[in-house]
Regions:
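Structured alpha/beta reader/binder surfaces that contact nucleic acids or chromatin modification marks
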Residues: 1-148
Length: 148
């Protein structure tokens, strides 16, 4: 099965259906099922990087993301280094001004929708519980495991 490694909390937001697009600097011709792998990168490091990039307070970013999981402290408990779900990749959209204008604000907050990047569009998101430990890779890769 094809797999894609995504940093937390975005991996869990995708498989829970709170996020429909994963943004990348590159396009893919692949369409079909993809295992969603949560990277080993600690969530706190990702939040700190996001806060610095957006010139915001780390706490503001943390509170906003925590609220999406509906319970305080949930971010620190997200699985890493594991397959957390699967989804169907249906489209790979070039990000343009027109494309951005059609997105809801929450979606824009959950990715880098810079002009010229690509928004991978997912449907039929299914979380896996418990997550399946796996080593990730960069790019679109083949996972030898099974979610059946």
């Amino acid at each position: 099965m094809k797999a894609l490694t995504i940093w937390q909390p975005w991996a869990s937001l995708l498989v829970s259906g709170q996020k429909k697009y994963e943004t990348r600097s590159w396009a893919t011709a692949y369409r079909g099922p993809i295992a969603i792998h949560a990277a080993m990168r600690p969530v706190r490091r990702t939040i700190d990087a996001l806060a610095a990039d957006r010139e915001g307070s780390g706490w503001d970013v943390l509170e906003r993301l925590d609220s999406l999981f509906l319970r305080p402290g949930a971010l620190d408990q997200l699985p890493t280094g594991a397959i957390v779900g699967k989804a169907i990749l249906t489209r790979c959209n070039l990000i343009t001004e027109d494309f951005r204008a059609k997105l809801p604000p929450q979606e824009l907050d959950l990715g880098d929708f810079s002009i010229g990047r690509y928004a991978w569009e997912f449907h039929v998101m299914v979380p896996v519980d418990p997550p399946v430990k796996a080593s990730g890779k960069q790019g679109l890769w083949t996972w030898e495991g099974s979610l059946e």
